[in-house]
Each structure stands twice: as structure tokens, then as C-alpha cells.
């Protein structure tokens, strides 16, 4: 997978923002 970490893990299709995970 291509999960990214920004305080919590976000996996596609979600993505990291300054406030955490966000849906597309």
C-alpha cells in the first residue's frame, strides 16, 4: 500500500492534510 503518516496513518483514497486524514 501507499499509506502515509501524518500523526495517524492515511491510506488511499484518503490523504494527509495538516489536520489529519481527508477523503478525496
Swiss-Prot record:
Fill in the PTM field for this protein.
Answer: The three Pro-12, Pro-13 and Pro-24 were found to be not hydroxylated.
The signal peptide here is none
Q: Is the Ligase keyword given for this protein?
A: no
Task: Report the main location listed first in the record.
Answer: secreted
GO terms under cellular component = extracellular region
| Source organism, top-level taxon | Eukaryota
> What are the annotated disulfide bridges?
3-11, 6-16, 10-21
Q: What are the subcellular locations of this protein?
A: Secreted
- What tissues is it present in? Expressed by the venom duct.
Question: Which key words tag this protein in UniProt?
Answer: Disulfide bond, Secreted, Toxin
| Record carries keyword Manganese | no
Gene Ontology MF term list: toxin activity
Domain free text: The cysteine framework is VI/VII (C-C-CC-C-C). Displays a mini-granulin fold, a structure composed of two short, stacked beta-hairpins connected by two parallel disulfide bonds. This newly described fold is derived from the same cysteine connectivity as knottins (ICK fold). The name 'mini-granulin fold' comes from the structural homology with the N-terminal region of the human granulin.
Protein name, as recorded: Conotoxin pr6c
Organism for this UniProt entry: Conus parius (Cone snail)
